[in-house]
Structures are given as structure tokens and as C-alpha cells.
């Protein structure tokens, strides 16, 4: 429309019609959408039927031209509630934090000209009797710190460990643009009400081949989604580390399982004859002396196709090798990925 092409954003629930955008006090859902055209801005749309239909609102929530950094990369808004007010993180280029009392009119709280990312996210976790905040940089890297008022402005302050470095959030080659989902606001520092926070990533990458996948494999869409992951924090030697665990609901998808306890050798392939398009393998290895690598060949085919999942005992590294995994999109796609 006149505001530009619509890109990514997020949805928040206005339970009390604080925005005055809805026809009743029951409120509804507000979508915050990037509009790209002569710079970027955040526009609004609303739904009063739980997301089945949407109506654009003639209102710009925030515009790059009004931002102190004057940077046209002003996209990927993520909205959350904390301490009785609404917050929005925006980036695409440098990170900004905005706040609002009514979900419609927003003011800048703090800017981070040297911290660039797409798809920013900011959410809390309770650990060691306190609330810590995780800043996601596109789902690839993260920082842990505090969201607090500094000189009257809400500011993300990273922990000392994360001031000049990031934690690695996802080692997967095809994992980007993470988004989190949850069912309520986060409460207050005095009374936090932090729900389970679930993360979902785009299973593709801008690094090399994302725009080649659909054509090579005959799809009409660009990528798919990774597993849903439950977010957590863990204190490791005084440093808070992000944890990501597949949600418990995946266990409901389990079919009949098979258990093996055996010594693996050249003549007793435990998975020989096993067929399936998706499966879960839970394993424990007790390597014999001199063993250097253990792992699995999965999705094997009669034409030599296979995907290798290998743990290297000497390097203490796990490796995914898909150089023979069917259609090869590009050289980058075929590269071995280790962590």
C-alpha cells in the first residue's frame, strides 16, 4: 500500500482495548508490521476474531525518520509487556527499544548504534532467584543482561561477559530469523509471571543459497521451520548460558519405539532394515579403546545417498555431513557443519 511493501513483524494481544482500536472492551489482536518503502516504518493491523480476518489501521506506530539514529533499516518489530507497559524492539540495522502505554503511540527509550541485527527479540528468564533478559540477534547469537532504567530510560545492559562478545544461539547452518511465542505478559520485577517461552526458526539462511532452494527441489515457498524449542537459562561457572530444548509436545508424536543394547561392529548394523521419513534417536555410546568417532548414517538410499551425524571423540565435536544428502543446492549447502 502507500506505506510500502509489508515485511515481517509480530502480534500482541490487547486484552482490555487499551489501544482503543477495537469495538468492545474485549480488545483483540494487534499486528505490528514492517512497511518497506523509502525507508521502513511499523504499521498496524487488528483482528477481532482471533486472527481469522485482519483490518489495516490508518496509523504508523513508529517511523525511521522520527528515530534518533536516522537509519532507514527499521524493521522486524517484537512487542512484549513488562512492568505495566509495552515495549518494542526494532532493528534491521541498529537495535532500538521503544515503549508505549497504549500499544499505539510509541516513544524511543534507548538506541544501540553499534549493535546490528535482523529479527531482534528480548525476553526474560528466571534463574538463581532473579530475572535475567536474553537479547536474541536473529536467532544466531545472543547476549544475557538486564532490562532496567538508566537515567530514566529503559535500557538493555549486557552482563560483563557479554559486553564485547555474543553467545552462539544456534549452530545449525539453516537456522535464522528466530521468533518467540508465549501466552501472557512477563509481569513485574517484584512479581514476575514469565510463561514458557517457545522459539521457532526459519529453516534457511541468507548466507548463500536460500533463494535457490525452492527452484532446485520444486517448491513454491522459501524454506520451512525448524523444531519448536523451549527457552531456558543455566548458570555455567558464573556465566548465564542459553538453553534450547525441543518442546515436550513432540513426545506425543512418538510411535512404537525399539530399544537395542549391543556391541556395534561391522556385521551388526542395528538400524539395518529400518525405514522411516522421520524418527527420533536417543543413544548412549561406550566407545572401545582407540575409537575416534561414533555416530549414525541416516536417510540412506540405494543410490549412495546418506546423511552422517558423527561425534568426534578427539575433537569433542559433533558434525553433520550432508555432502551426499540428495539434491545439492550449492557448495555451501554441502559443507560439513561442526560444533
Whereabouts are the PLM-identified features?
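Surface loop/turn signatures of beta-propeller and other carbohydrate-active proteins
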Residues: 1-23, 51-81, 90, 106-124, ...
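Entry beta-strands of beta-propeller and related beta-repeat scaffolds
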Residues: 18-32, 85-87, 129-134, 192-199
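Beta-strand C-termini and the immediately following turn/loop, strongest in propeller blades
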Residues: 33-37, 90-92, 137-138
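Short glycine/acidic-enriched loop and turn motifs that connect beta-strands
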Residues: 35-39, 140-141, 206-207
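Conserved Ser/Thr-centered positions that define the repeating blades of beta-propeller domains
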Residues: 45-48, 97-100
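Loop/turn-rich, solvent-exposed surfaces of beta-rich toroidal or solenoidal domains
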Residues: 121, 126-144
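Beta-rich accessory regions
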Residues: 149-151, 159-165, 169-173, 184-339
Amino acid at each position: 500500500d502507500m506505506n510500502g511493501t509489508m515485511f515481517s513483524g509480530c502480534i500482541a494481544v490487547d486484552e482490555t482495548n487499551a489501544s482503543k482500536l477495537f469495538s468492545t472492551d474485549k480488545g483483540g489482536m494487534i499486528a505490528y508490521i514492517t512497511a518497506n518503502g523509502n525507508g521502513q516504518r511499523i504499521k498496524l493491523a487488528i483482528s477481532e476474531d482471533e486472527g481469522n480476518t485482519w483490518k489495516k489501521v490508518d496509523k504508523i506506530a513508529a517511523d525511521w525518520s522520527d528515530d534518533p539514529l536516522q537509519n532507514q533499516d527499521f524493521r522486524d518489530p517484537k512487542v512484549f509487556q513488562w512492568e505495566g507497559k509495552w515495549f518494542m524492539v526494532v532493528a534491521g540495522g541498529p537495535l532500538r527499544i521503544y515503549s508505549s502505554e497504549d500499544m499505539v503511540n510509541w516513544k524511543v527509550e534507548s538506541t544501540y548504534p553499534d549493535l546490528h541485527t535482523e529479527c531482534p527479540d528480548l525476553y526474560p528468564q528466571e534463574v538463581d532467584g532473579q530475572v535475567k533478559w536474553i537479547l536474541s540477534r536473529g536467532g544466531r547469537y545472543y547476549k544475557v543482561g538486564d532490562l532496567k532504567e538508566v537515567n530514566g530510560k529503559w535500557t538493555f545492559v549486557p552482563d560483563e561477559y557479554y559486553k564485547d562478545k555474543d553467545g552462539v544461539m544456534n549452530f545449525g547452518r539453516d537456522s535464522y530469523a528466530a521468533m518467540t511465542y508465549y501466552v501472557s505478559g512477563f509481569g513485574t520485577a517484584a512479581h514476575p509471571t514469565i510463561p514458557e517461552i517457545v522459539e521457532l526458526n526459519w529453516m534457511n539462511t541468507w548466507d548463500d543459497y536460500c533463494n535457490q532452494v525452492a527452484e532446485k527441489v520444486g517448491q513454491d515457498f522459501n524454506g520451512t521451520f525448524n523444531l519448536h524449542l523451549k527457552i531456558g537459562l543455566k548458570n555455567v561457572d558464573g556465566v548465564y548460558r542459553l538453553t534450547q530444548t525441543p518442546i515436550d509436545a513432540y513426545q506425543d508424536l512418538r510411535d512404537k519405539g525399539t530399544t537395542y543394547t549391543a556391541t556395534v561392529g561391522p556385521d551388526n548394523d542395528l538400524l539395518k532394515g529400518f525405514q522411516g521419513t522421520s524418527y527420533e534417536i536417543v543413544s548412549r555410546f561406550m566407545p572401545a579403546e582407540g575409537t575416534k568417532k561414533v555416530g549414525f548414517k541416516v536417510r540412506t538410499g540405494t543410490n549412495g545417498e546418506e546423511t552422517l551425524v558423527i561425534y568426534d571423540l578427539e575433537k569433542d565435536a559433533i558434525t553433520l555431513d550432508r555432502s551426499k544428502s540428495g539434491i545439492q543446492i550449492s557448495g555451501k549447502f554441502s559443507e560439513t557443519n561442526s560444533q
